[in-house]
């Protein structure tokens, strides 16, 4: 049940608001919300006596609906200024509507907590994501026809670079030969032979190193571009609302795992809208009739 709920509640974005009220002997507090599609929770944190409260017994009571949809009253805290002026509830969550009252004592009593609202994501953000997916798919289609011509261009460029490197090597060799001719006039005839033997492996090593450096990067570049194009051609598709049969199957699976479904029609309708994003009233009524038959 928890896994299915996490999966279905993913489009909802929680928001937290501060909550606080003051209770007196003749003043109750009613917490109500508009009948919208968002889920609301009242999380109570602390109950404490206010300044000027008498040293007498104060009993704080909450009235809300139980799982069966019937009203129920629960004692939240019992306070006394000289014994226990404050109580921490540690996140006591109640689904509205809720009535908070001071059953015993004159007050004042302060209650603080949080108002939790599960808000659906804006439709504008979803439309922007769809537009980005469309742009990626269009750019992928446009770049596909010209992809085959990039490799020969790289090969031609590589060959041109090798020719330029060879020309540079020849120029360097000519300069070295000119210097050697000037030096040969002062030494014996055996010296040029030794120098030519020493220069030959160095020239070959330079050419082999240059050829090795120029020829290696061509392969990984083409593979990276092809993998990026494959990612552009497979955009994500947004998930739409589930069908009635799929929703029934998910509910039945959650019941078999030990979960339960709301028994009150209003809560069941709100549960279907939020969890499965179902807006068809006929389909919702069909699901409610199916729920009552279980």
Curated annotation (Swiss-Prot):
A motif (Nuclear localization signal) lies at residues 152-157, 192-198. The record marks 55, 80 as: Interaction between pentamers. Residues 1-187 are annotated as: Required for interaction with SENP3. Belongs to the nucleoplasmin family. The gene is NPM1. InterPro entries: NPM1_C, Nucleoplasmin, Nucleoplasmin_core_dom, Nucleoplasmin_core_dom_sf. The modification Phosphothreonine is found at residues 75, 95, 200, 219, 234, 237, 279. There is a cross-link at residues 230, 263 (Glycyl lysine isopeptide (Lys-Gly) (interchain with G-Cter in SUMO)). Keywords: Acetylation, ADP-ribosylation, Chaperone, Cytoplasm, Cytoskeleton, Disulfide bond, Isopeptide bond, Nucleus, Phosphoprotein, RNA-binding, Ubl conjugation. Residues 188-216 are annotated as: Interaction with NOP2. The modification Phosphoserine is found at residues 4, 10, 43, 70, 125, 137, 139, 227, 242-243, 254, 260. This is Nucleophosmin. It comes from Bos taurus. The modification ADP-ribosylserine is found at residue 208. There is a cross-link at residues 32, 248, 257, 267 (Glycyl lysine isopeptide (Lys-Gly) (interchain with G-Cter in SUMO1)). The modification N6-acetyllysine is found at residues 32, 150, 154, 213, 229-230, 250, 257, 267, 273, 292. Residues 189-201, 223-235 have a biased composition (Basic and acidic residues). The modification N6-succinyllysine is found at residue 267. One of its GO terms (molecular function) is protein kinase inhibitor activity. Residues 203-222 have a biased composition (Polar residues). Pfam families: NPM1-C, Nucleoplasmin. The modification Phosphotyrosine is found at residue 67. Acetylated at C-terminal lysine residues, thereby increasing affinity to histones.
């Amino acid at each position: 049940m928890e896994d299915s709920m996490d999966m279905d509640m993913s489009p909802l974005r929680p928001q937290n608001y501060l909550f606080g009220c003051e209770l007196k002997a003749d003043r109750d507090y009613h917490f109500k919300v508009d009948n919208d599609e968002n889920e609301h929770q009242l999380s109570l944190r602390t109950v404490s006596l206010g300044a000027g409260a008498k040293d007498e017994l104060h009993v704080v009571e909450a009235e809300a609906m139980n799982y069966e949809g019937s009203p129920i009253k629960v004692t939240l805290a019992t306070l006394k200024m000289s014994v226990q002026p404050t109580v921490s509830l540690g996140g006591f969550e109640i689904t509205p509507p809720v009535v908070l009252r001071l059953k015993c004592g004159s007050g004042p009593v302060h209650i603080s907590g949080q108002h939790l609202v599960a808000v659906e994501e804006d439709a504008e953000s979803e439309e922007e994501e769809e537009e980005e997916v469309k742009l990626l798919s269009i750019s992928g289609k446009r770049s596909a026809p010209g992809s085959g011509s990039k490799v020969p261009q790289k090969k031609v460029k590589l060959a041109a670079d090798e020719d330029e490197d060879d020309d540079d090597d020849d120029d360097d060799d000519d300069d070295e030969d000119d210097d050697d001719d000037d030096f040969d006039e002062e030494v014996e005839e055996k010296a040029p032979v030794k120098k030519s033997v020493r220069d030959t492996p160095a020239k070959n090593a330079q050419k082999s190193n240059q050829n090795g450096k120029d020829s290696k990067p061509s392969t990984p570049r083409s593979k990276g571009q092809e993998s990026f194009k494959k990612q552009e051609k497979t955009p994500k598709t947004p998930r739409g609302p589930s069908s009635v049969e799929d929703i029934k199957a998910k509910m039945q699976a959650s019941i078999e795992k030990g979960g339960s479904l709301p028994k009150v029609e209003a809560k069941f309708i709100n549960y279907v809208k939020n969890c499965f994003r179902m807006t068809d009233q006929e389909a919702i009524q069909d699901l409610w009739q199916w729920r009552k038959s279980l």
